[in-house]
Amino acid sequence: MKTLGVFILLSWLSTSFAFAQQNEQQKDTIQKLDEVTVSAQQILGSKFQARNRTGSAYYISPQEIQKMGYTDINRMLKAVPGVNVYEEDGYGLRPNISLRGTKAERSEKITLMEDGILAAPAPYAAPAAYYFPNAARMQAVEVVKGSSQVQYGPFTTGGAINMVSTAIPTKFSAKLSASSGTNNTLKTHINAGDSKKHFGYMVEYLRYQSDGFKHFENKQNAGFKRNDLIAKFKVNTAKTEGANHSFELKAGYADEDSNETYVGLTQSDFARTPFLRYVGSQKDHLTTRHTQWVGTYLLQFSNRLKFTTHFYYNTFFRNWYKLESVKYGTSANEKRTIGQILADPETNAPYFDILSGKTDSRVFYNDYERLKDNPGLFVRANYRNYFSRGVQTKAEYKAIWGNCYLDNEWGLRYHTDEEDRNQWDDIYAMKNQQMQLLWKGLQGSQANKITRANALAAYWLSKLTYKQLTVTAGLRFEHIELLEKDYTTADTRRTGQKRIETTNVANAVIPSLGLHYNLTDWLSAFAGIHKGFSPPGVSKEKRVMDRNGNITLLTENQKPESSINFEAGLRVNYKQLKTEVIGFYNHYSNMLGSDLAAMGGTGTLEQFNVGEAVVKGAEFIAQYQPFPEESPIKTPLQLSYTFTDTEMKNSFESNSWGRVIAGDEIPYINRHSLNLSIGAEYKKYELNIGIRYNGAVRTEPGQGLIAERHKIPAYTIIDVAAKAHFARRFTLTLNAINLTNRTYLVSRHPSGLRPGHPLGIFGGIIYKVN
């Protein structure tokens, strides 16, 4: 804890210096600090703040979100440079997001937040984001990268994404948004709220459902249904001189009921019928429930000094019941995973024929004790419970003397999260393209363990502005304790007769330095350097305990992910033109990978050391409005481009990536991606067009030309949104995604080829009262 003591000392010295300088000012001098008001739930709050940081940042404003009316976070983020995403289900329900070349799978290497609170089910113990906040109910999305992100952890290599939910309005307002369209896709979004002198409230409900664009030959539904309910209530003192207090309580509930699967298609079937679902996935079903409770206390003495404290408790349950493998004979070696079957359907033809329903599986044993030895389809219940809870607080102090402005921020968070895995396999026979239950598995017979993390995080950030120069220095500290209790599949009741305890402890000091200089009234330059960090998994020390309490120690070594990251860029803000160009270079001394079923691994979620790696690239964005502000015609244009180059420096083998050779690229990272947005606004009418280009992507580690079997070809997708405003309250909307109805491949994982969303057309209404 010596490091934490140094951290506190540095913070105290910066505070003392600021107070001393302020006290030297003349008492009769009236000073005013101009600031952009940012709510306690936001980290940027405006495009102005994003453009004036010493590091890279982007603010997707409410106006931007409303233009295209997206419900898919993948489409929402497409305009942000430095962001890589690859689709999975076509609706953005469980996105795979990478920031500056971090691993994209389940967005597990970014700091994901909702209203400033960690949002992944168990961000330290099991960071894969199987829960992602519903983008359709967000009023803004904030993305910070590079040296801008030292306040936000634990993942500091690529960046952080903060989903900003609907705020309590300053006066009464209500909104109804409803749409319907292709594949019986329906969305209903309602919110209402008000504020009085000493209290305010907001309630919100979102219903989102679809029959899905994939289909079974027997017309079985392949869609989903989602519900989101949010309520906020705030009490506050009058905003007068002296200390002001406010307390806001946020409660949320969300659930999902979907027929989503990990089963994709063979190469030949994708070419013929890209939206087909094999009958072997007819029992695949996902059920989730999520709750959140957040209490936010704000104490503000003045515009210069305020304290914000959050208390939070989140729970998440999910049971993804999905096909795991197929067994053709009675012996154990006559069993193949879905990934193996779809990767080579010719060699595994007997297994594929059962999966696709071309042939029935055989039943050799009818007595109860031998039923589980029969051939058939093994469907795994991926039954998991999560919770995360904690308290985080920050203090902000602003001082001014002469031409110098000093902003100080200190933060502290104590956090606990847990994942409870209790999984089993059921066995089905295939008969006349219908799956019939043969054997009901025992809960806990496939995975039976609890992983818990306790984490203490603290940070200090100081921003000094002198004339045209801004210098930002920061320091973050992370102390993480991990414990896994594996009760083993032999002790499904968790009696404790035998369990394997795995522990790990990680400490990290994460410094950050950023510079921003206004070269002219319209041109500025910035640069930054910071340390990247990602928590390790629980695989350092294993304690095997028998029924007599005897412990056997086994040791392994897993280090945290660590990197040194550089960035430099220029910003132009000239009349109606705003541009930004950035170069970045991330040098990993140790990169971590994960054994995820979503990547075709075994699904243990255990992390492995990749070792040294380099990710470098460039980001560009330009925004232009040809017509002056007072013109009745608006034609906003935006172009963004990202180039990313990755290289792993070590050779190794893993369940997810197989054999990796030094020099291989990281899979599922776009080398080139480009987005163009074109808008036209005149009086009551709006038309917005989004054009997205994704270059070819490699789905397995490799180098040189991409082999066809490991390739996602380049594609261009066009989306269009039109609006007509009638009176002040009523709007008609018409949206089309994938306007040209292009059939395109988005992934070869977890098992087989998966298509992107085909043409979708949706009409709707928006009704507002305010």
Please place each PLM-identified region on the residue numbering.
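N-terminal periplasmic "start-of-domain" segments of outer-membrane beta-barrel proteins
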Residues: 35-68, 93-96
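Transmembrane beta-barrel wall of Gram-negative outer-membrane proteins
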Residues: 180-209, 218-261, 285-289, 295-302, ...
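Membrane-embedded beta-barrel scaffold of Gram-negative outer-membrane proteins
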Residues: 300, 306-312, 316-320, 324, ...
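Extracytoplasmic beta-strand/coil segments of soluble accessory domains associated
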Residues: 74-121
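Signature of Gram-negative outer-membrane beta-barrel scaffolds
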Residues: 378, 405-520
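Short acidic/polar hinge/loop motifs at secondary-structure boundaries
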Residues: 117-145
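Gram-negative outer-membrane beta-barrel transporters
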Residues: 465, 578, 583-589, 604-701, ...
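Surface-exposed extracellular loop regions of Gram-negative outer-membrane beta-barrel proteins
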Residues: 257-259, 263-273, 481-493, 503, ...
